[in-house]
C-alpha cells in the first residue's frame, strides 16, 4: 500500500532559500521586471507564495501554465477530464521569464512547459526555479535556483499538497504493484 509519509522539510526555509537565490540571480544577470509563470498545480502554489518574498522583483500578474496537452505520456496515463487552459496575462516575447515548479525530477514536466511557452512567443530567457530537486533526470534539464536538494530512493516519490498549508510527503512505491 502506498501511504504518504510527511517529510520534515522546513517549508519556510525552502522558500527563503528560493527567494534569496532568485533575487541574487536576477540582480547578477541584470534581469529587471521578469514575468513569472507557475506550472499547474504545485508550481502555481509555489509561485504564488514566492511572489510575496521577491522584493517587488515581478510586476506582472502570475502566469499559469497547464501543460496537459504538451505532456509526452498522456497517451499512457490518459487526459484529465477537466483540463483548464493556460493563463498568461502578458506577452512572453522578448521577456525574461521565471518558470516555477514544485518538484524537479525527470525533467519531462519542464520540457512540456518550455514547449508551451515557446508556442506563445520567444522569451529573452527562462530561469527555472524549483522548490525541491531530486535525482532521476531523464532529460538534460537543470534548475537555475533550488530551495532544497532531496535524496530519495528510486522507489520513493515526493508530493506537494496544498495550497494551505503547503506540505511535502514521501510515497513509497511498491514495485510489485
From Swiss-Prot:
<comment type="function">
    <text>Regulates the transcription of the pyrimidine nucleotide (pyr) operon in response to exogenous pyrimidines.</text>
</comment>
<protein>
    <recommendedName>
        <fullName>Bifunctional protein PyrR</fullName>
        <ecNumber>2.4.2.9</ecNumber>
    </recommendedName>
</protein>
<keyword id="KW-0328">Glycosyltransferase</keyword>
<dbReference type="Pfam" id="PF00156">
    <property type="entry name" value="Pribosyltran"/>
</dbReference>
<dbReference type="GO" id="GO:0006355">
    <property type="term" value="P:regulation of DNA-templated transcription"/>
</dbReference>
<dbReference type="InterPro" id="IPR000836">
    <property type="entry name" value="PRibTrfase_dom"/>
</dbReference>
<comment type="similarity">
    <text>Belongs to the purine/pyrimidine phosphoribosyltransferase family. PyrR subfamily.</text>
</comment>
<keyword id="KW-0808">Transferase</keyword>
<dbReference type="InterPro" id="IPR029057">
    <property type="entry name" value="PRTase-like"/>
</dbReference>
<dbReference type="InterPro" id="IPR050137">
    <property type="entry name" value="PyrR_bifunctional"/>
</dbReference>
<comment type="function">
    <text>Also displays a weak uracil phosphoribosyltransferase activity which is not physiologically significant.</text>
</comment>
<dbReference type="GO" id="GO:0004845">
    <property type="term" value="F:uracil phosphoribosyltransferase activity"/>
</dbReference>
<dbReference type="InterPro" id="IPR023050">
    <property type="entry name" value="PyrR"/>
</dbReference>
<feature type="short sequence motif" description="PRPP-binding">
    <location>
        <begin position="97"/>
        <end position="109"/>
    </location>
</feature>
<keyword id="KW-0805">Transcription regulation</keyword>
<keyword id="KW-0804">Transcription</keyword>
Amino acid at each position: 500500500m502506498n501511504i504518504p509519509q510527511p517529510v520534515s522539510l522546513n517549508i519556510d526555509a525552502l522558500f527563503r532559500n528560493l527567494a534569496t537565490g532568485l533575487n541574487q540571480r536576477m540582480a547578477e544577470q541584470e534581469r529587471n521586471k521578469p514575468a513569472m509563470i507557475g506550472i499547474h498545480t504545485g508550481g502555481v502554489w509555489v509561485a504564488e507564495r514566492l511572489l510575496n518574498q521577491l522584493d517587488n522583483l515581478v510586476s506582472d500578474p502570475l502566469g499559469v501554465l497547464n501543460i496537459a496537452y504538451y505532456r509526452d505520456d498522456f497517451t499512457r496515463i490518459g487526459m484529465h477530464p477537466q483540463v483548464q487552459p493556460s493563463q498568461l496575462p502578458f506577452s512572453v516575447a522578448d521577456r525574461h521569464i521565471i518558470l516555477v515548479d514544485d518538484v524537479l525530477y525527470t525533467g519531462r514536466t519542464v520540457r512540456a512547459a518550455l514547449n508551451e511557452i515557446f508556442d506563445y512567443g520567444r522569451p529573452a530567457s527562462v530561469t527555472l526555479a524549483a522548490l525541491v530537486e531530486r535525482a532521476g533526470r531523464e532529460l538534460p534539464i537543470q534548475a537555475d535556483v533550488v530551495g532544497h536538494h532531496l535524496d530519495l530512493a528510486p522507489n520513493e516519490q515526493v508530493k506537494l499538497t496544498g495550497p494551505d498549508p503547503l506540505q511535502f510527503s514521501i510515497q513509497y512505491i511498491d514495485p510489485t504493484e
